[in-house]
Curated annotation (Swiss-Prot):
Keywords: Keratin, Repeat. GO terms for cellular component: intermediate filament. Belongs to the avian keratin family. Abundantly expressed in the claw and at a low level in feather tissue. The keyword Repeat applies. The keyword Repeat applies. GO terms for molecular function: structural constituent of cytoskeleton. This is Claw keratin. Residues 83-104 are annotated as: 3 X 9 AA tandem repeats, Gly-rich. Sequence repeats lie at residues 83-91, 92-100, 101-109.
Length: 128
């Protein structure tokens, strides 16, 4: 006895967007069962069972190396902007490697980062 799949096609991960999730119902219909009762010969057909599930799928990833940019977002989340290499949440900005909460800024040798201390205007750290 084989069951035919009535499931929707699976989600396909693509580079854009960087986060994707799916909730898709899946239903399988199996063939009917037949029983012969003797004597006298009587045929009774029982409907095949319907099996259902609700699989969940989620993927979060990166589309590759972020582009270097500038401004309020470097573009928003990459580059040298609000969430990227030199911005409010990235490599050299407000929350990144050289910024407010990251590796070399107001948070590395500063508030909330790897060390304790501060960062001067010249870029040198105090007591880290």
């Amino acid at each position: 006895m084989s069951c035919s799949s009535l499931c929707a096609p699976a989600c396909v991960a693509t580079p854009t967007p960087l986060a994707d999730s799916c909730n898709e119902p899946c239903v399988r219909q199996c063939p009917d069962s037949t029983v012969v009762i003797q004597p006298p010969a009587t045929v009774v057909t029982f409907p095949g069972p319907i099996l259902s599930s609700f699989p969940q799928y989620a993927a979060v990833g990166s589309a590759g190396v972020p582009a270097v940019g500038s401004g309020m977002g470097g573009t928003f989340g990459r580059g040298a902007g609000f969430g990227g290499y030199g911005g409010l949440g990235g490599y050299g900005g407000y929350g990144g490697l050289g910024g407010y909460g990251g590796y070399g800024g107001f948070g590395s040798c500063g508030y909330g980062g790897f060390g304790r201390g501060y960062r001067s205007l010249l870029g040198s750290c105090g007591p880290c």
